[in-house]
């Protein structure tokens, strides 16, 4: 459970520095993880982004102060990171469905979010099916887009990219280069790391290839890794989302493995059929 304890250490760090302008890279460091992998894991375990958790917790504590102290509303707004009373009031109403003034007068029920403690329930009734494989470095060819992790932009925009490439013929072009070991279309997520743009990822739609060039497409080298390949079966995107959650909430905490921090992949069959028995895979590099 060491992996889970690292996540909790990062959460405790956020709580201890809740009134500060937190650097997500520093938070992730508490979990021994990159910014991307920490934020991804946090969202899968809690169904809430890191920024949303911080916002909820700060507004919860602000509501408590409004109810229990005589501090001025403007001072409380500044204390919890809002530059103007108007911005504070707007955010406060969105969460608590009342204004700060109404909260001070005890009107209505506030939406209070408690400090988070990660607990994992090991269900096991429907275990994830997986296989461990060793694979040397290989090349993929495809197109990439850059996405921010802030406010879940990547979660909203990546499905739009898939719709785009499925409708404009890009997938058909890519499949002509698919002559490597992995048969199918890949969704490859590359953490840019702290030395590049903080809070950004490169997302590739690609195929494995042995060819050096691909015309309009770019190439990316995937490092040699030990991979855990998880089976995903069922209609998209529900089956994929459910499996990701199971991996991080049930499999990783007891597996003895850690994420290697290199690119991870989803593998989809070329025909793209959307049926109840649709088969796809999740490839995660581990150490």
Predicted segments, located by residue:
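Absolute protein N-terminus
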Residues: 1-3, 128
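A solvent-exposed interaction/effector surface
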Residues: 40-44, 48, 60, 64-67, ...
């Amino acid at each position: 459970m060491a992996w889970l304890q690292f996540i909790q250490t990062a959460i405790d760090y956020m709580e201890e520095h809740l009134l500060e302008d937190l650097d997500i890279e520093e938070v992730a460091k508490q979990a021994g993880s990159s910014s991307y992998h920490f934020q991804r894991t946090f969202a899968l375990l809690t169904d809430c982004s890191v920024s949303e958790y911080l916002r909820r917790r700060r507004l919860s504590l602000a509501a408590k102060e409004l109810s229990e102290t005589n501090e001025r509303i403007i001072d409380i707004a500044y204390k919890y990171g809002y530059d103007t009373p108007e911005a504070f009031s707007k955010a406060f109403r969105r969460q608590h469905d009342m204004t700060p003034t109404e909260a001070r007068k005890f009107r209505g029920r506030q939406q209070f979010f408690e400090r988070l403690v990660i607990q994992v329930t090991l269900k096991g009734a429907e275990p994830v099916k997986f296989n461990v494989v060793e694979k040397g470095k290989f090349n993929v060819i495809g197109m990439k887009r850059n996405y921010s992790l802030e406010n879940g932009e990547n979660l909203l925009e990546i499905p739009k990219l898939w719709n785009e490439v499925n409708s404009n013929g890009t997938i058909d072009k890519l499949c002509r280069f698919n002559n490597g070991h992995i048969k199918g279309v890949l969704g490859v997520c590359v953490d840019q790391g702290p030395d590049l743009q903080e809070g950004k990822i490169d997302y590739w739609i690609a195929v494995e290839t042995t060819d050096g060039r691909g015309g309009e497409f770019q190439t990316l080298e995937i490092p040699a890794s030990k991979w855990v390949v998880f089976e995903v079966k069922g209609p998209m995107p529900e089956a994929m989302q459910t499996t990701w959650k199971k991996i991080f909430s049930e499999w990783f905490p007891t597996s003895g493995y850690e994420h290697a921090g290199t690119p991870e992949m989803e593998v989809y069959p070329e025909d793209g059929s959307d049926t109840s028995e649709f088969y796809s895979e999740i490839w995660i590099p581990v150490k």
